[in-house]
Amino acid sequence: MSAHVRQTQPFRWDGIEVKPYKSEGAHFAGITRQLLFAGGDGLGCELRYFEVAPGGWSSLERHHHAHAVMLVRGRARVLVGNRLVDAETHDLVRVPPLTWHQVQTAGDEPLGFLCMVDCDRDTPERPDAEALAALRADPAVAEFIKV
């Protein structure tokens, strides 16, 4: 990657491909990703930009690595463990390791967020029936989650 990559239009960068969020599945909707920094040259982490259309959501998942998220566009409702967080532009959200999490748009405009993760990370795990039952024990969480 060049030392400087120009933004070509809002939330789009020269030479950075807009990709599907994940390769397949119905456990997410209306979300794309862009890999802004791939972690080479000793960086040790990746910086990704995710964009979620109004009414969209990420997958409900957990993994051994942490996430550091900064909203840069729109508003979100975020599940972190068993807590629902309302976040807006420039808010920070930390997702600790092995914590169930899901992001959903809140409002009529797209949601955009930067997500920093370690380059060396594991594959996300989706909840099994037992984990879903535990999450759904809280009525607010049960109403929120989409699988």
Could you tell me what each predicted segment is?
Residues L47-H63:
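Conserved short histidine dyad/triad with adjacent acidic residue
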Residues G56, H64-H65, R83, T99-W100, ...:
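A generic "binding-loop/recognition-motif" signal
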Residues M1-G44, D128-V147:
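A short, N-terminal "cap"/entry segment at the start of jelly-roll beta-barrel domains
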Residues H65-H67, L71-A76, G81:
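Glycine- and acidic-residue-biased ligand/ion/polar-headgroup-sensing regions
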Residues S58-L60, V78-L79, V95, H101-G107, ...:
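Short beta-strand His + acidic residue motifs that chelate non-heme Fe in jelly-roll/DSBH
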Residues N82-L98:
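Short acidic-glycine-tyrosine-enriched beta hairpin
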Residues Y49, R94, D108-R126:
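A short hydrophobic beta-strand segment most commonly corresponding to one strand
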